[in-house]
Structure formats: C-alpha cells, structure tokens
Amino acid sequence: MSTDPDEREVSPALTVGDGDVDVSLRPRSLREFIGQPRVREQLQLVIQGAKNRGGTPDHILLSGPPGLGKTSLAMIIAAELGSSLRMTSGPALERAGDLAAMLSNLVEHDVLFIDEIHRIARPAEEMLYLAMEDFRVDVVVGKGPGATSIPLDVAPFTLVGATTRSGALTGPLRDRFGFTAHMDFYEPAELERVLVRSAGILGIQLGADAGAEIARRSRGTPRIANRLLRRVRDFAEVRADGVITRDVAKAALAVYDVDELGLDRLDRAVLSALTRSFSGGPVGVSTLAVAVGEEASTVEEVCEPFLVRAGMVARTPRGRVATALAWTHLGMTPPAGANQPGLFE
C-alpha cells in the first residue's frame, strides 16, 4: 500500500500537522538557536560586520537536508539585522515578472528569503543575477522588434536562499552568494536540548531519560524531534498521567512504529524486502519499490537517504545492497561477506 511521505512521523518535510506549533517553537535569535555552532559563529560575524558598517550583508546561501532550521535561520538573520523579512519559494517564481514585482516592493536593508531556491524558473533566475549584483532589474515592455528594456533600481537588500540540493544550483547563481553555510545533522545531545526547550514552551513535563530516548530516534533532525515530542505528549495525556517518562516515550513511539534507531514501517519494509526477498541485493530501486508497494521516487528520495546514512543500505553500481547492520537490526544473521559499517559512517 502506497504511503504519503508527508504522513510519516519521521518525515523531515514540513507537514500540515506541524503548522502553528512549528512556528511557536522557532528560535528568535542566534543565542536561542541550538546546534550548528560553526554556522552560528560565522553568521554572527557576517551580521555584526554589516551592522558595524551600516550596510547590508552579503547574500547568504543555506544548504542542507530538510528540517534542520534553514527557515528559522533566515528569520533570525532578519531579526538580528532589525530588517523586514519577505518570504517566497523557488517554485512560486515561475516568471520573471513574479520576481520583479517582489523586488520592486523591497525597501533598503530588507531580507528576501527564497526557499527551495534550486527550483526557481530560469527566466526569474536570470533576472535575479542582476538584482543580486547591481541592485537593479531590466523589465522588458512590449513584444517583438518594438520591445524595450526599462532598467529599474532595486533597494539594497540581502538575499537568503535555502536549498536541500546545492548541487542543483547553477554556477552563476551559486557564485553570487557571498557566504555559503552547510547545515549538518544534529547529534543526539543537541536534539535533547531542542526537546527540553520545546517541552518548556509547550508546557510538557519531560523526564531527562525520556528526552534522550526521543532524541536518538529523531534521525538527527529537530523537526522530527519536535513532531515525535507532540505524539508522545498525546500518548502521555491519554494513556498515562501526562508526564513523559522513558517508559512512556518508548511505549508511545512503539504505537507510532518508530523503532530505537528512528526507522518506521516503510523503512523496515524496504530492509525486509532487500534482505528476505532479494537475499541482501544488489537490486535496482524500481524493483525494490515494487516489492514494497511504493513509488520508486518515494524509496529513493524518502527512505534511502537515511538508510544509507545509518549504514544499513549501500549504493553500488549494480544496485542497492543490505549491510550487516541491516540484517542484525531485523534480527537476522548477516550472510558471509556482508560489509559491516558502523552507524552513520
């Protein structure tokens, strides 16, 4: 049975259920932002340098997997600069005119945030080049031989672009960002701090051991950690006394099919098919997807990245292969010759 990737509790993508709660949990300053110490230090220098000069910072590109806080950092950058934030996304900018309208409404020192900037349409991207470099755009009026280009000045602004696929950016666009930061997955200890902060904001009684239990199942992603915290809260309020202990957390996550390594039903189905149906592989992703009743894109884009990062699946020229860790996680004996990478190697 096909699964909507956004319905998974361990999906790093923003879901409808995250909504207003996700907004309420966002940090509002670099001091409040947990994790990514190197990125925070670098951004602090970029922001403070611009404030000292009384100018606008260089354009900033934030890259990394979904759910790590790129949008939160864009909001923080604007707040730290004391500037207004204008938000849009790459898919929303289908025409150059869409971008021109947004740029013409900017005032000096505004921060323009474009999420999924790698998906911006080519005509809009080409207009963005000139705006980023010279703070102007050329608007074409008319068609055919009679068309004329009218230059329009744009107020000096800072573009913050966010992408989960930095390699998909064109060279000319990437080169126009003065500062690029890559965000890494969080360590369990950092996620535990995120959970403690979120629990305080939401008024949740969270035991220390319970925070650690949820953190290690959160795939290194704060958005997943906060979502699991809300699901465990529901369980604690309905089936316990409202206090989240380690045992309550374990019982709740078992109900939601999230195991001790953060794998859910779909992840385990992929591993089970790979080991039991295909003897560990190699097997092509399309064949593997048919075996679990999913789209190939779901297996490749939703399940596989975490399974590879966790050291349970290896990509080879001949197809996907289950590692020794995948066999042992399913309670099976690895066949002779299975490689044995450590977790997250």
UniProtKB/Swiss-Prot annotation:
Residue numbers spanned by region Large ATPase domain (RuvB-L): 1-186
Region Small ATPAse domain (RuvB-S), annotated ranges: 187-257
Keyword Secreted: no
GO molecular function: ATP binding; ATP hydrolysis activity; four-way junction DNA binding; four-way junction helicase activity
InterPro entries reported for this sequence: AAA+_ATPase (IPR003593), AAA_lid_4 (IPR041445), DNA_helicase_Holl-junc_RuvB (IPR004605), P-loop_NTPase (IPR027417), RuvB-like_N (IPR008824), RuvB_C (IPR008823), WH-like_DNA-bd_sf (IPR036388), WH_DNA-bd_sf (IPR036390)
Residues noted as binding Mg(2+) in the record, renumbered to the chain: T71
Reactions catalysed according to its record: ATP + H2O = ADP + phosphate + H(+)
Stretches the record annotates as Head domain (RuvB-H): 260-345
Quaternary context: Homohexamer. Forms an RuvA(8)-RuvB(12)-Holliday junction (HJ) complex. HJ DNA is sandwiched between 2 RuvA tetramers; dsDNA enters through RuvA and exits via RuvB. An RuvB hexamer assembles on each DNA strand where it exits the tetramer. Each RuvB hexamer is contacted by two RuvA subunits (via domain III) on 2 adjacent RuvB subunits; this complex drives branch migration. In the full resolvosome a probable DNA-RuvA(4)-RuvB(12)-RuvC(2) complex forms which resolves the HJ.
Function: The RuvA-RuvB-RuvC complex processes Holliday junction (HJ) DNA during genetic recombination and DNA repair, while the RuvA-RuvB complex plays an important role in the rescue of blocked DNA replication forks via replication fork reversal (RFR). RuvA specifically binds to HJ cruciform DNA, conferring on it an open structure. The RuvB hexamer acts as an ATP-dependent pump, pulling dsDNA into and through the RuvAB complex. RuvB forms 2 homohexamers on either side of HJ DNA bound by 1 or 2 RuvA tetramers; 4 subunits per hexamer contact DNA at a time.
Record text about domains: Has 3 domains, the large (RuvB-L) and small ATPase (RuvB-S) domains and the C-terminal head (RuvB-H) domain. The head domain binds DNA, while the ATPase domains jointly bind ATP, ADP or are empty depending on the state of the subunit in the translocation cycle. During a single DNA translocation step the structure of each domain remains the same, but their relative positions change.
Protein name per UniProt: Holliday junction branch migration complex subunit RuvB
